[in-house]
């Protein structure tokens, strides 16, 4: 399994404990923030869990969580570093050398099933798995014509019936 306790009988409970520890204790402690931040971060994670994959609109996330719109991008970075989410960026670069965030994903498929099983759409699960596996050794960016781009190659993630239409105009698809 993805986590060292993946075969334990109490797997789901243990995973939820890891999530709670990370969001409510670890990140706020690292930021030297108060306990109330942990609750807001967990709220942000749940909004992401129920919406993924989606293009983040900071104002809407702020309204849904009570977190300042200006703080949300930083908190998303901390959540990403903690292994809770993944941010798919475009390849433009920008001031910080990071492209604009195009989509948010939960970090791995286990988190999908633990946090929001009712939103465990198979397409979401496929994209999350692809992103989780490919980003280890590759710089994965969003594609303007499909789902992902890696080293100039375009990837469309789908089931048997998806076909090639989405990537037919890709130079390398």
Where are the model-predicted features located?
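Conserved catalytic cores of phosphodiester-cleaving nucleases, focusing on short active-site segments
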Residues: 130, 134, 148-163
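Proteins with a high burden of low-complexity, intrinsically disordered sequence enriched in S/T/G/P/A and R
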Residues: 1, 31, 156-158, 165
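Accessory nucleic acid-recognition modules appended to NTPase machines
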Residues: 3-146
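Catalytic cores of nucleic-acid endonucleases
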Residues: 141-145, 158-173
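Short glycine/proline-enriched coil/turn segments at helix->beta-strand junctions
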Residues: 66, 135-139, 150-153, 167-173
